[in-house]
């Protein structure tokens, strides 16, 4: 199951006037120039995974604006990545205090992860619940589709009607070989389901043949669908008229008997959708590779995704699928969903069944 990590805040500010006055030798324009330089250097270093360098730059920025929540959050994030958990905990708490009544949900994501590493179990649950509840609050005014008041049709064990959907692009063995392994495991774990891979021409032909040899469907996305991030391709299964139920999974995550037991519990329920959270870092409303549902609710998914992308309401391409699910799918899904949550983050969640 994908280990979903929090997003960088990336929000160093223009220096508040009161703080600039403490640096009388530096005028406001010069101060903002210095902050921008540190911010840009921090962002570049963090994107490259050089958190030691990112830390040096964001630390200098915090020295200039010590009470700014965004700067403190970025500092805590780099400390988290550097495994300086006590420092990260301190600065996340300072960032929350500096935020007043407007706390960024990402702060709770980071604190949940930090508390896990510090073995602060009760605080991990506390901040995990805040991470989930604040995201729910962010979506409360988003549009939703209607779900029929009746139960979904009973599950039929016809593998052609039940699809486990993956996106696959490129030749990286981490994704290609894991995908092939999943097709083998799915034959044993998910005999009532068929694996389907939405791919483009960057996937080696030999990989495609090996997937098909193991019973998987290989679907080449269209030229217009290619314009979307590959992370979205697997969602196209949602409006396939030949599909009755679907599961969305990550190409680099192994299917398991644990998740199958949870899926079977969903199939026996009267809920239209299913989602799972099974790690301390699972503080998003819908983990992009850990959910599923019944067909017939969402239509014209390609246009639905394009409409969301056009809004620009996401912090970066790495998490664009997560934010689409948060703002465009969750408001509908939440009306009828079975949530398996081993972390106790969701008040409506239940533990995973025995298997």
Question: Residues of each region from the PLM?
Answer:
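Catalytic core and acceptor-binding pocket of nucleotide-sugar-dependent glycosyltransferases
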Residues: 130, 294-355
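Start-of-helix register in tetratricopeptide repeats
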Residues: 36, 70, 103-106
